[in-house]
Amino acid sequence: MMTAGTARRVQGLAPGAPATAAVNRSGIAVTDEAVKVGILHSATGTMALSEGGSIQAEMLAIQQINEAGGVLGRRIEIAQEDGASDWPTFAARADKLLAQDKVAAIFGCWTSASRKEVLPVLERRDGLLYYPTFYEGLEQSRHVIYTGQEATQQILAGLDWVMREKGAKSFFLVGSDYIWPRASNAIARRHIEAKGCRVVGEDYAELGDTRFESIVARIKAAKPDVIYAIVVGGSNVAFYKQLKAAGIELDRQILMTNSVTEDEMMGIGGDYIAGAFTCAKYFQSLELPANRAFVAAFKAMWGADSVIGDVTHNAYLGPWLWKLAVEKAGSFDVARVIAASPGIEFAGAPAGPLRIHENHHLWTRTRIGRARRDGQFDVVFETRDLIEPNPFPDGFRELAA
């Protein structure tokens, strides 16, 4: 992995590239041969477990784009920065990428907390972020393309499925103590109660905390039909191990999580989380031709033991969606790329075709997967059609921070 601030160059300049003056009128880092973009994730700290795959996926996409001739005939160069699992650091590094490196776009962030810190920088510097993580919704910015699912595509869809298919009536909500889990659980609670079901407990642990004994004890005492867990980063390892140590077996106790993908399972260990359900657009096990090619390319670049989760897949989408928007706009200028983005379709996405909505989120399918001991998921449900994104669903708008 590259160190912060370094740039990686991959040859692939196509002939006949349009003149730089015609495709760059705003002073971003574009020459006749290259254009620079930023990658901004946590390579260190508690979030490195979750964000490492995003870095790898973005680098793979950029390499593939360069090998196919680049963007508007220019190869993509990367300026990488480490957010270090610290939200103000994310803001500072985003400012550097935009003000000093003058990148045309940033691919990055993972937590809602880091995204919220970066948003004012994007607005001040007129930047564009491709954000890969499923999140709570309740936000829409012209400076962000959200490649992950929002609440209606994940939280509500997952709850509706477990109520319908498992007959769930009572829920215990648990999460890491920051914006995304708290906002997501507020949405979940309202939806659960609107459906005539009950929340029998709600608890949080600090991000990075490894002491879950008291929370696990309260879960056992409450005896919920469903544990609804949004524990994030390295805390996942401790949480699931302590559930098992307390005798909570996920082949008997229903657990639905929005925060565990194949990436996190690699750190947790399949024996501790097998049986859990998660709602996502992507699973590595999807039997689609585009996904088989994606998995093969990812493993060829990063090793045969590499795994790919939903957010890693969403990160891979970012550079491709940016390329399509740049080529539609005929320009690297951020305002033109933003204007060109709605309606962009990515027919070759590993999870299946998707497109950008006017609200900067994605039309996409939703799937339910059940964790296996080998670190993969069995897909037990998927929607037939693409689900329209709605970051401000009826009855939830007032929850927006």
Label the predicted regions.
Residues 16-39, 70-75, 163-169:
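Immediate post-signal peptide segment of exported/extracytoplasmic ligand-binding proteins
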Residues 30-32, 37, 56-78, 194-196:
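Signal peptide-proximal N-terminal region
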Residues 243-316, 327-332, 383-400:
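Extracellular/periplasmic periplasmic-binding protein-like sensory domains
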Residues 23-25, 49-56, 69-138, 205-212, ...:
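Beta-alpha junction/loop-to-helix N-cap segments that form part of ligand/metal-binding clefts
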Residues 1-20:
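N-terminal export signals
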Residues 103-203, 253-277:
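Extracytoplasmic ligand/sensor domains, especially the bilobed periplasmic-binding protein
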Residues 13-18, 35, 345-401:
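Solvent-exposed, acidic/polar segments of extracytosolic/periplasmic ligand-binding ectodomains
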Residues 22-57, 81-88, 110, 175-182, ...:
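Extracytoplasmic "Venus flytrap"
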